[in-house]
């Protein structure tokens, strides 16, 4: 695979290999055949980051080869959304002959939605001033004249200039209901929107008929919490990053959801609060003991769950675990399988043509 060519004819073969690999990894814990969710074969990534290479009068996007570290020129990127591809050529055309926008530009980040909105961040090794803002506004207006719904941001050391806003609003059809998700520049969002829809619908399916409340750790912008709210009496969710918490609060209001409570704290702190080890000022007004959480949802970072959180989640009758790293999932399952068994297993092809796998398991108490 090269950045400008996807081996789409090999899509089914690479997916089949992942299914075999996941089944093999899960064999000590389950003999289930994974439910498999396919990605679009191209234009599936909603965000992308490129370094910018200056070559005489020319400049262009590059990425670095992971093995050789050599730079690769990228003029089109079929893994990314069609809007990102349109913007890549439009941004280079708009910056190439503009000394103010071009000077010391070293990276461009793109974030897009299925609803055809974009935030583009230009990163610089220089101070940004009013002249930069004026030139950036002219570029933004020229892009919008081409029917590109785009917001521009300038970044430099300790500097961030938003011309309008630093977010876009995604609209996803999830099990017959449109969900609105605010996505903030430089915060985590699901990279493959089509796959995100399938993940949300799978999570809804496996929690159908749930009793009681849901607890979610690492909720981000509320991606799963808000979609799953319809299956539970109440949802209590934790998140540590301030921009994600703010986006989650916006999303609760935008989706007219009244049974989700977001609290800003780390999973480790929440474990201490639940166990009565510590009291936290930011939990004032929230009666943790009033929640009857029968299900816990975790979507941890690549490192998986730490040992304290492992112990904590074992206290819940049902554990819904979305993993971006099956190796750490299996490590966690060595502990979790002592008290719980795997009821459902899914493979989500979030990153086609790569080694990476995303998967989901539903565990129920033995």
Curated annotation (Swiss-Prot):
Lineage, top-rank taxon, reads: Bacteria
Homology family? Belongs to the class I-like SAM-binding methyltransferase superfamily. RNA M5U methyltransferase family. TrmA subfamily.
Q: Which gene encodes it?
A: trmA
State any GO CC term.
cytosol
Q: Which UniProt keywords apply?
A: Methyltransferase, S-adenosyl-L-methionine, Transferase, tRNA processing
Catalysis: reaction(s): uridine(54) in tRNA + S-adenosyl-L-methionine = 5-methyluridine(54) in tRNA + S-adenosyl-L-homocysteine + H(+); uridine(341) in tmRNA + S-adenosyl-L-methionine = 5-methyluridine(341) in tmRNA + S-adenosyl-L-homocysteine + H(+)
- What is the purpose of this protein? Dual-specificity methyltransferase that catalyzes the formation of 5-methyluridine at position 54 (m5U54) in all tRNAs, and that of position 341 (m5U341) in tmRNA (transfer-mRNA).
Q: Give EC number(s), comma-separated.
A: 2.1.1.-, 2.1.1.35
InterPro entries in UniProt: MeTrfase_TrmA_AS (IPR030390), MeTrfase_TrmA_CS (IPR030391), SAM-dependent_MTases_sf (IPR029063), TrmA_MeTrfase (IPR011869), U5_MeTrfase_fam (IPR010280)
Classification via Pfam families? tRNA_U5-meth_tr
One of the record's GO molecular function terms: tRNA binding
Source species, please? Escherichia coli O7:K1 (strain IAI39 / ExPEC)
GO BP terms in the entry = tRNA methylation
Active site annotation, chain numbering: 324 (nucleophile), 358 (proton acceptor)
Q: Which NCBIfam families match?
A: trmA_only (TIGR02143)
Task: Please tell me where S-adenosyl-L-methionine binds in this chain.
Answer: 190, 218, 223, 239, 299
Q: Which protein, by its recorded name, is this?
A: tRNA/tmRNA (uracil-C(5))-methyltransferase
